[in-house]
Amino acid sequence: MMQGEFESLKALNGVLPDFAPEPYAWGQFKSRPDTHFLLTQFREVGEQPPNPVKFTARLAELHKKSVSPTGKFGFHIQTFHAKLPQITDCWEDSWAVLYRNQLAQMIRLDDEKHGVWPEFRKLCTLVLDKVIPRLLEPLQSDGRSIKPCLVHGDLWDENTATDVDTGEPFVFDAGSFYGHNEYEIGNWRAARHRLSDKMYVRNYKRNFPMSEPEDEWDDRNLLYSLRYDLGTAILIPGCNQRQVVKENMTLLCERFFPEELRALQGDVPMPGLRDNASDDEEEEEEEEE
């Protein structure tokens, strides 16, 4: 995990120096081989999240300037979403293929954490097999293309800040890879995050135009939010994000595959439902992660 963050910070600094703390070293303690460390430049945290105009301009600059070393989507090493392993140590020509694999991995981790919820699992299959190809394959077909951009991988309020000394925005706690730039914004959809303020998305779009087809930007954003919200469901016991993901999957299936959705719908109870944690509690526990 430490090596993944070290390589993420190294990649971010390679594109935009000072947009992330410079990494110095990582390793394990001789006296405790199961304990690892990461040594980076110290940056004093100020306002969180940073000013939307400055921050989104720098983020868009990162996405525009970054160049995948293979021209493909992926990364040269596995990185992590908090403490959850991501499928990043591969290279794919198709963004749809990589995102499908990444979301499928998060679904498997959710099953391991909470147990299989049959109704939810059926929705997951429909999203993986139908919705993802429908929404993401058009990005790279009929003459359209998207560039593999270096993404931070987990941009929420507490992983962004204004540097007290310079007044400039910076990011940290990265789990990077080369993906669709719009994936980065999927984490801003959740109302529990201050980055969900429309100023951030609006200013980002001014710096990095929407991918074609533009009229499906919001649908893609909802699709990308699923992976982040599933991560929250796994990391924070008792939160309501599993239910939120189910509802958002249902919305996507209703919009694009209504007949298939009706064919699989049924009343299947969710095992161990604990969905009464507040947004404040979620933020506190995310911060601990």
List each model region and its residues.
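ATP/Mg2+ or Mg2+-diphosphate-binding catalytic cores
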Residues: 232-289
